[in-house]
From Swiss-Prot:
Keywords: Repeat. It comes from Schistocerca gregaria (Desert locust). May be involved in the remodeling of the basement membranes or of the vitellin membrane of the ovarian oocytes. Residues 1-29 are annotated as: 6 X 3 AA repeats of [GA]-Y-[PAG]. Sequence repeats lie at residues 1-3, 8-10, 14-16, 19-21, 22-24, 27-29. The keyword Lipoprotein does not apply. The keyword Repeat applies. This is Glycine-proline-rich protein. It comes from the Eukaryota.
Length: 30
């Protein structure tokens, strides 16, 4: 499992990247 994207995360579909706060976002809507 992975942490859900929080509001304000720059998320890109198909890409795992670190968003604000250091948590990864996996294609979740910002």
């Amino acid at each position: 499992a992975y942490p859900a994207a929080h509001q304000g995360y720059p998320a890109h579909v198909g890409y795992a990247r670190v968003g604000y706060g250091g948590y990864p976002s996996y294609g979740y809507p910002a």
